[in-house]
Design a protein with these regions (language model features):
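Single conserved hydrophobic/aromatic residue that forms the stacking wall/gate
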Residues: 1-11
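Helix N-cap motif at beta-to-alpha junctions
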Residues: 13-16, 58-62, 92-99
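Long insertion/accessory domains within large nucleic-acid-processing enzymes
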Residues: 21-23, 47, 92-96, 103-225, ...
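A common structural junction motif
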Residues: 23-31, 69-77, 106-114
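Short acidic loop-to-helix transition motifs that present clustered carboxylates
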Residues: 35-40, 84, 120-122, 213-214
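Short glycine-/aliphatic-rich beta-strand segments at the starts of folded cytosolic domains
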Residues: 45-57
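Phosphate/diphosphate-binding loops
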Residues: 56-70, 226
Length: 245
């Protein structure tokens, strides 16, 4: 077990991912937990890092972005409109508050938003909990190979992270649950065959395109009880404490 340290969210997204990718290409296999901030004791008071966030979005997305950053302890510093339909927002927020926000930001703005952040200062730790991912995950409760029949039925319960014919193990995260709780599922379940074939019972199974996470996106997605597993051949996410077989 080892720890890698750096400064700011930029480190987490760039330096950490570069380090992991380098190790991956050299043949290493490793599991990475959710990034955490480094707090300091200054004159008997616990301090945490804060970052300056500059966001450029369409005006129609301004409210949703501000609503999402509120529970993350971000404080608005400035709002500036270009009078052409876009607005620039400036915030100061604790670094732990924006871990995992970038992927949500892209979803909120439909990929049209621009966000940059830079370390600003160390300040007193903000009281209260930081907002977490609002949805639970679907994770495999059995090892095997995924089948279209099982995935077709699971896609009604959330968004899938993999397609047909993929090897999975117990505890592997296979999708985002539509509700706030985690859901154990069987993505390897096959259709039971019978000797009777009725007209109209066989249908073509159409799977919704699944979400594929990059390393950076996976690191932002996971929560405290989850890990990103990296091998030379794959990037996967899993629940901690589940038996891997």
């Amino acid at each position: 077990k080892s720890r890698s340290r750096g400064l700011g969210d930029v480190y987490k997204r760039q330096h950490l991912s570069v380090l992991i990718e380098t190790m991956r290409r050299e043949g290493y296999e490793l599991a990475i937990s959710k990034p955490k901030v480094i707090q300091k004791d200054i004159n008997g008071v616990l301090h945490e890092p804060f970052e300056q966030i500059i966001i450029d979005v369409e005006e129609i997305h301004q409210g949703a972005v501000m609503e999402e950053l509120g529970p993350r302890k971000a404080e608005i510093q400035n709002i500036e409109s270009d009078n052409k339909g876009r607005v620039k927002l400036e915030f100061i927020a604790p670094s732990r508050g924006i871990i995992g926000f970038r992927s949500q930001f892209l979803t909120i703005t439909s990929g049209t938003g621009i966000m940059t952040s830079v370390f600003d200062h160390y300040g007193s730790v903000k009281a209260g909990d930081i907002a977490k991912r609002s949805n639970g995950v679907m994770y495999s409760m059995i090892a095997g190979k995924t089948l279209s029949y099982a995935l077709f039925n699971l896609q009604n319960r959330g968004k899938l992270f993999l397609g047909h014919g993929k090897e999975v193990y117990i505890g592997q995260i296979v999708g985002l649950h539509s509700r706030d709780n985690d859901l154990p599922v069987n993505p390897t379940k096959s259709k039971q065959l019978t000797n009777i074939r009725a007209a109209g019972t066989d249908e073509n199974l159409i799977l919704i395109p699944h979400i594929q996470h990059t390393l950076e996106q996976a690191l932002e997605f996971i929560e405290e009880d989850e890990l990103v597993e990296v091998t030379p051949d794959s990037i996967r996410m899993r629940k901690k404490g589940k038996v891997r077989t």
